[in-house]
């Protein structure tokens, strides 16, 4: 068969298969054109999920009649001329409008601000129907009807109208985040009107519009520069996380991207603070010289290629970790909100257990005896971590049953987490702050403190160990024993000394001194499982912090152990100065805060 030149219409339809995958793809291209034209107001209207109608109106610079005719021709553009090295616009290929016109009925009406009148062009299935004068306001209105009517096979691959409308909404949200100075309005027969008023340079206000006030309340500012590459944006505290990565937004020179390198860097930055299967919420904006990034590697321009990907990844990971450390004692505000909803009239819990009748024996005001298996003696590991200065300043609270003195402004206002007032169910510390109260999960909080202390020691020197008077003997499968012994030298750096004790057994002779009393059996078994899962032949050097987190969990104050008042206060003081203390090593919150105004509202006093 002879080789022949394809028709212009067929060429455009082939290009449309790459550029215009669905109605949301067309919406993205048209919104980008409006932004490149300098629009400050963009309105999007849809019907039938964008298949029946997609209209994008803007107040941008507009076009003359000659520009309209060129705009629907392939590879005609005003945005680049001779090189791809300095792309500063969202669009640049000149493919979007001819691709849309080849598979749909396209109508464009436009008028320049300095023109007395406007013009319109109509295209159907790749053929120009007419070009004529038309009444138009300054700016451009692009109307797409019957998308894919010229290639009906493509319609079979589209999702439901609701799903397609949702994809368009997501595109508008991403554009709204990237351009807070632009007003966006999305309306149509298949949705309620969505409006994002312009917020100027107030990016956080736009985040609140798009992502909700909860994100604004749980966001940490990012602002970092490395070798002329700048990173700005907001990262959510670790306890403010989601079940998928859909709430991670990345922009490169203002262009929304879904780049694997950036998403991987976000995961890496939160690796030690978020539970498996949960995802952080983040909005990142990277600004760099256009010559240092290639945006022409994907038909939809959703992926980019950095000249120095390692530098970009390091910038993202470092900036997020530094921000989390700087503001690390914060926990998400959502926990308190959920708890408050439980007290409001009409709230129905998922499962309500019958309550036992009240009696003096079960009264919550009765002093708790020591929990089974625990003594009243403080745990050694806690004393080693407590700050001497904090312990010297704080006076012990009265014994149970004694009158409780009123908290002074000096006591509650001096410390963000307040002063300990009680311990409930031998697990939760209740502290009074200047404007409310804080409830702390003692095990989760102490686990984080131990981990941070171990991590700090790891970076400075070998961890001190304590010799066990009687070694702990743990029976394990032979393969687990072999794996552990392969990494015995590295575990000794963490203060854990082990050796073989015959076939199928490990002897633990030393444990990290800062952990105090350790559940050696549980620790060794979990380490064996983790090493088997990692299956690392190159050693544990890259995983030592994960091992430290496991040790911290097994060496922390346990749930069910009573703490003395000075121990509780020392724990609060240590949390205030420890990075990341707002969440445990598994990403769960270590405390929740209730403002006095919220409590008063529950009792109708607001």
From Swiss-Prot:
Keyword Cytoplasm: no
Function recorded in the entry: This protein is involved in the repair of mismatches in DNA. It is required for dam-dependent methyl-directed DNA mismatch repair. May act as a 'molecular matchmaker', a protein that promotes the formation of a stable complex between two or more DNA-binding proteins in an ATP-dependent manner without itself being part of a final effector complex.
Organism for this UniProt entry: Rhizobium etli (strain CIAT 652)
Keywords: DNA damage, DNA repair
Biological process according to GO: mismatch repair
Pfam families in alphabetical order: DNA_mis_repair (PF01119), HATPase_c_3 (PF13589), MutL_C (PF08676)
The name this protein goes by in its record: DNA mismatch repair protein MutL
GO molecular function: ATP binding; ATP hydrolysis activity; ATP-dependent DNA damage sensor activity; mismatched DNA binding
């Amino acid at each position: 068969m002879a080789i022949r030149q394809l028709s212009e219409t067929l060429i455009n339809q082939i290009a449309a298969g790459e550029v215009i995958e669905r109605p949301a793809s067309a919406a993205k291209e048209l919104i980008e054109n409006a932004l490149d034209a300098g629009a400050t107001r963009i309105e999007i209207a849809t019907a039938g999920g964008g298949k029946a109608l997609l209209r994008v109106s803007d107040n941008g610079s507009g076009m003359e009649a000659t520009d309209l005719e060129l705009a629907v021709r392939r590879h005609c553009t005003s945005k680049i001329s001779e090189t791809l090295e300095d792309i500063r616009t969202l669009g640049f290929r000149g493919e979007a409008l001819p691709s849309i016109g080849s598979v749909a009925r396209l109508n464009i009406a436009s008028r320049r601000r300095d023109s007395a009148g406007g013009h319109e062009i109509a295209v159907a299935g790749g053929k120009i129907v007419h070009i004529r004068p038309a009444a138009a306001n300054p700016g451009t209105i692009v109307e797409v009807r019957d998308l894919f009517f010229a290639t009906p096979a493509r319609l079979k691959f589209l999702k439901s109208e609701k799903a397609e409308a949702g994809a368009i909404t997501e595109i508008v949200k991403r554009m709204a985040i990237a351009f807070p100075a632009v007003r966006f309005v999305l309306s149509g027969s298949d949705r309620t009107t969505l409006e994002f008023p312009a917020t100027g340079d107030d990016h956080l206000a736009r985040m609140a519009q798009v992502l909700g006030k909860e994100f604004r309340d749980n966001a940490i500012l990012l602002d970092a520069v490395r070798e002329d590459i700048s990173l700005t944006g907001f990262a959510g505290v670790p306890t403010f996380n989601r079940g998928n990565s859909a709430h991670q937004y990345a922009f490169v020179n203002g262009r929304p991207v879904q780049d694997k390198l950036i998403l991987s860097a976000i995961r890496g930055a939160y690796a030690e603070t978020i539970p498996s299967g949960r995802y952080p919420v983040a909005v990142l904006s990277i600004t760099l010289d256009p010559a240092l990034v290639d945006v022409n590697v994907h038909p939809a321009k959703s992926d980019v290629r950095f000249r120095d990907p390692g530098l970009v990844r390091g910038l993202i990971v470092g900036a997020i970790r530094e921000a989390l450390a700087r503001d690390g004692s914060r926990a998400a505000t959502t926990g308190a909100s959920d708890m408050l909803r439980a007290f409001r009239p009409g709230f129905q819990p998922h499962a309500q257990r019958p309550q036992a009748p009240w009696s003096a024996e079960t009264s919550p005001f009765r002093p708790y005896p020591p929990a089974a298996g625990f003594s009243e003696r403080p745990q050694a590991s806690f004393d080693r971590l407590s700050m001497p200065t904090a312990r010297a300043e704080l006076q012990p609270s009265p014994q149970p049953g004694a009158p409780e003195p009123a908290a002074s402004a000096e006591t509650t206002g001096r410390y963000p987490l307040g002063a300990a007032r009680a311990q409930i169910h031998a697990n939760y510390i209740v502290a009074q702050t200047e404007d409310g109260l804080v409830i702390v999960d003692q095990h989760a909080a102490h686990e984080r403190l131990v981990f941070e202390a171990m991590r700090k020691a790891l970076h400075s020197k070998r961890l001190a160990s304590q010799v066990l008077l009687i070694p702990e003997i743990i029976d394990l499968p032979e393969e687990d024993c072999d794996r552990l012994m392969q990494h015995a030298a590295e575990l000794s750096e963490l203060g854990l000394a082990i050796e073989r004790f015959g076939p199928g057994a490990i002897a633990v002779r030393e444990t990290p001194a800062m952990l105090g009393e350790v559940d050696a059996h549980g620790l060794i078994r979990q380490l064996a499982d983790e090493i088997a899962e990692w299956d690392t032949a190159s050693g544990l050097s890259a995983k030592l912090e994960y091992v430290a987190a496991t040790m911290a969990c097994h060496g922390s104050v346990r749930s069910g152990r009573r703490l003395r008042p000075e121990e509780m206060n020392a724990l609060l003081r240590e949390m205030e100065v420890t990075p990341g203390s707002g969440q445990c090593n598994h990403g769960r919150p270590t405390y929740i805060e209730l403002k006095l105004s919220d409590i008063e509202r529950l009792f109708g006093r607001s």
